[in-house]
Amino acid sequence: MAMWRAPSAAGQLLGRALASTAAQTSAGSKKVVGVFYKGGEYADKNPNFVGCVDSALGIRGWLESKGHRYIVTDDKEGINCELEKHIEDAHVLITTPFHPAYITAERIKKAKNLELLLTAGVGSDHIDLPAAAAAGLTVAEITGSNTVSVAEDQLMRILLLLRNFLPGHHQIVNGEWNVAGIAHRTYDLEGKTVGTVGAGRIGRLLLQRLKPFNCNLMYHDRVKIDPELEKEIGAKYEEDLDAMLPKCDVVVINMPLTEKTRGMFNKERIAKMKKGVTIVNNARGAIMDTQAVADACASGHVAGYGGDVWFPQPAPKDHPWRYMPNHAMTPHCSGTTIDGQLRYAAGVKDMLDRYFKGEDFPAQNYIVKAGQLASQYQ
């Protein structure tokens, strides 16, 4: 089915929405553009390292065998970047949270043939979702592809921070040996109160992973988790976030970035937390007030902050989180383990196959469908 741009906004929305209901198309060669991070010297070190631009999700041969064009790049910034050159006539754009190409309303307007925006991974906040909805585009992601990867990473960072591991490691690398310098702020996880702000797939799995550590588990979300699972985990629901925070030794952020959650953890909210709290955030950097986090770490009100999400990404060299004390920050990598890459690469291939056949995607994968945003982004 050939796509077209109606002269009116209403006509455009109707035309695109009708097509996107079945996730588009039918006949003809399609131009698929992918934006991924560089593999560089590491691209050939693992045949399953498919998430980089060099391997391009491992779907080039499959796409080209079906007569489609597949353009991949890591160049996404500025008016002369490769993404700008190719977005105008692209039918499908694949992006990733780990090297986010910010798809603005201006870029959407420029993309005359665009029908489908796919996120290779989870989290589509790098896309102007209201603009995509207004244009009648379909936006989808690989829901669940990084659940295990991120939950394991969160547990790791909790332990790294509580056990004061990184300063000890740096001592060894630097030829030092000072037990007191580590032990004076090292704690067990057992008996601590851990609260997750958000109890979706990742939050629930984290609570399950924490149960063997004999922690006091709490969670805040818009809705309660299944009563049987809640009982099995032994987690307590807290409807009032600000009532939960002062009780927690560890706070883990597990919510999507929306206009409601942007900057949600500001100076005032962080001040409500227990002095010496540990915070882990693998959700989105913009949920936090950047300077408020750095100041709280410097003052000692926050004993440690860890995560892999920043705003913006890549983080500039002068980003305060790079230099604040007692942090366990890395580039955005928790959801792009080799196992995670294989899951979201397979998911992208499956959804492209459905798209070419005019079939619907799994319902949970839709972020924007027929002009409507998924509930978590409303």
From Swiss-Prot:
Subcellular location: Mitochondrion
InterPro entries assigned to the protein according to its UniProt record, in alphabetical order: D-isomer_2_OHA_DH_cat_dom, D-isomer_DH_CS, D-isomer_DH_CS1, D-isomer_DH_NAD-bd, FDH_NAD-dep, NAD(P)-bd_dom_sf
Chain positions of site Important for catalytic activity: 284, 332
Catalytic activity entry: formate + NAD(+) = CO2 + NADH
Cellular component GO terms, alphabetical: chloroplast; mitochondrion
Transit peptide range per the UniProt entry: 1-18
GO molecular function, one term: formate dehydrogenase (NAD+) activity
UniProt KW tRNA processing keyword: no
Documented EC number(s): 1.17.1.9
Residues annotated to bind NAD(+): 147, 201-202, 221, 256-260, 282, 308, 332-335
GO biological process per UniProt: formate catabolic process
Residues bound to substrate: 122, 146
First-tier enzyme category under EC: oxidoreductase
Purpose of the protein: Catalyzes the NAD(+)-dependent oxidation of formate to carbon dioxide. Involved in the cell stress response.
PANTHER family: FORMATE DEHYDROGENASE 1
Similarity annotation: Belongs to the D-isomer specific 2-hydroxyacid dehydrogenase family. FDH subfamily.
Protein name, as recorded: Formate dehydrogenase 2, mitochondrial
